[in-house]
Curated annotation (Swiss-Prot):
Induction: By anaerobiosis. It is involved in the activation of genes necessary for anaerobic respiration. It probably also activates genes involved in the production of virulence factors. It is found in: Cytoplasm. It comes from Capnocytophaga ochracea (strain ATCC 27872 / DSM 7271 / CCUG 9716 / JCM 12966 / NCTC 12371 / SS31 / VPI 2845) (Bacteroides ochraceus). GO terms for biological process: regulation of DNA-templated transcription. GO terms for molecular function: 4 iron, 4 sulfur cluster binding; DNA binding; metal ion binding. Keywords: 4Fe-4S, Activator, Cytoplasm, DNA-binding, Iron, Iron-sulfur, Metal-binding, Transcription, Transcription regulation, Virulence. This is Anaerobic regulatory protein. The gene is fnr.
Length: 92
């Protein structure tokens, strides 16, 4: 579902709780982007993969699923592209 910005802006002006929730969500997205930039620029391959798996585990737990056992639906190539690593590095 897509809501035009103007409509969302008008609604959030009339509903302070909506504005607060939007700010919280946007803040979380910005923080996630900053964390990814740090991950890609400062961490070695093993640390990148560790953080990736940890974050997946945390997200599964937040949604009520097992944080210890889950299926990775991404291919090794997809994970490598996401983390800036080669498929060979991911396979090790």
């Amino acid at each position: 579902c897509e809501i035009p910005f103007e409509t969302l802006d008008d609604l959030s002006g009339k509903m302070p709780n909506l504005r607060q929730q939007m700010m919280r969500l946007m803040s979380g997205e910005i923080k996630g982007d900053q964390d990814m930039i740090l991950l890609l620029s400062k961490k070695n391959a093993e640390e990148r993969l560790d953080v990736f798996i940890y974050n997946l585990s945390r997200r599964f737990a937040q949604r009520g699923f097992s944080p210890r056992e889950f299926r990775l639906t991404m291919t090794r190539g997809d994970i490598g592209n996401y983390l800036g690593l080669t498929v060979e590095t991911i396979s090790r």
